[in-house]
Amino acid sequence: MKKSLDHLPPRKQAELRQVVETVRAAFEEAVFSRRADRLKNGKILKIILYGSYARGDWVHDPVGRYFSDYDLLIIVDHEDLTDYEFWREAENRTMPVGPDIRTPVSLIVHALDDVNDQLDRGRYFFADIVREGGVVAAALVRLSRAVDKERGREPSQRQ
């Protein structure tokens, strides 16, 4: 997984930072008034950019009216936090209608346990994200034993 998004132009980097801040703020508002600790104390563990912007082959074609979107995998600490009710406002706020965010944004949300399970099962979609994606925001959390095996480490050697 890439640790830098330096291949993106400065304007795209700034826009992506704004997207991340917007997503985080909307999520914090969505969990703020919850009573259950697992929801009230819910956390975004990682936000990973994948797809064309992560690979560096995005399209910006005003003539053909085609524009690549930011594909973001959001990893949360509890399965219940993947429910759409927590992300509706984040999606609304990241629509490309204002001067701060002009690129379409596509969010998918999975719990860490689910992502690790998908990686352990060798699901291509998740394996591609780990291989090609770039971490936009992260807490100190590791993904799957499958990633460790790919890198020649035993799970007990995780940092």
Per-segment meaning from a language model:
Residues M1-I48, S52-S68, V76-Q159:
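Catalytic core of pol beta-like nucleotidyltransferases
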Residues L72:
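Conserved RNP beta-strands of RNA recognition motif
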